[in-house]
Amino acid sequence: MESLTLFRNDFPEEEIHVVAGHQVVTMENIEVLALFVRQGLPNGLSLHETVDRVKELGGIPVLPWGVGKWFGKRGKIIKEFLVNHEKGNLFLGDNGGRPCFWPTPNLFNLAEKTGVVVLPGSDPLPFPSEALRVGSFGFSLQENSLHGDSPTKCLKNALLSPNVTISPFGCLQENRLFFLNQFRLRRIS
């Protein structure tokens, strides 16, 4: 599986790598991103089974933050999972849709203490205006980390390296836009 590599005409030395992946919803109603996985995974497995399947397929599992999705019972399940997980090959995901006023989620602090890296990403909502947000919140890696025959393999190896340095970029969502988008989401669901 190779990534799609994009170059900007105005900055040809800068590359953007897009890799295969998809979202799965567990039995506990927790979202898991399966990065570097093209093969579909079934929804409805337990969190443990889902993460194990992603790893078996050579992927990287990411538990993405979402508004209200890490509170209550689901938050407790994720917390327990973070505390008891096998080290390596698990990430949490932040997203640019988190509003400016929202404090850093407690599970991100726990992740740091347990050696789990937080990967930022834009995660735009399904509205035309959100298309402009794609790639506006994310991370970069050290300059030479993606050189080699396979950018996908290099990216995956860099992310799994115990010495990985994630350099986040972008801003959290403006409060007014956050509330507007949440209102719009509830109207369409």
Regions found by a protein language model. Name each.
Residues 1-6, 55-62, 102:
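Short charge-dense sequence patches
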